[in-house]
Amino acid sequence: MSSVARQELLDALRQHAHRNGAPPLHPDAARLLHWLALTTGAQHALELGTGNGYATLWLADAMAQNGGQLISVDRDAVRQEVARDYLARAGLLDVVTLRCDDAVAAVETLDSPVDLALIDLGDKEAYLPSLRALLPRLRPHAVIMADNVRSHAQELAAFLDWIRAEPRFALTELPFGPGQALLCWLPDRAGTR
């Protein structure tokens, strides 16, 4: 797919998301996530919160270039069908498994270790249990982006406090739109709990 055609699909997805009250990942955060997937050579990516598929399309493109696979999880089957349609139009459906499931339940059944993850769930209370369930499935130096940490700071306070207290995570916060936490999993770091 040409970069122009891909951009047209991404623009259409963003418009669809805003019309339907489900703002997607900020474009700059999506581009950074795509770049991180490519530069780390991620093979197994996980998206918790498919939404309408905007970030899914970015991640799927990186997985296609890396020869990897993406699992994208959402409880909303209607939104996943929108994502499926756009992924098919982009020719990327073959690198994505869409799962209509609870985030924690889906994480607990993963077969492959995770190199890269995006947490962008509508249910902010599910961020921390999802991340905790993900820990034993993360490869060393796995990268995780969690969206909405500034716009939903109060709802995600326990999530962020837990990360800050966990010495096996390196954390930086990004300023794009609603804010993102960018984490790197360092399991051999001293002071683990």
What are these regions (language model features)?
Residues M1-L116, D123-M145, V149-R193:
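A short alpha-helical cap/connector motif
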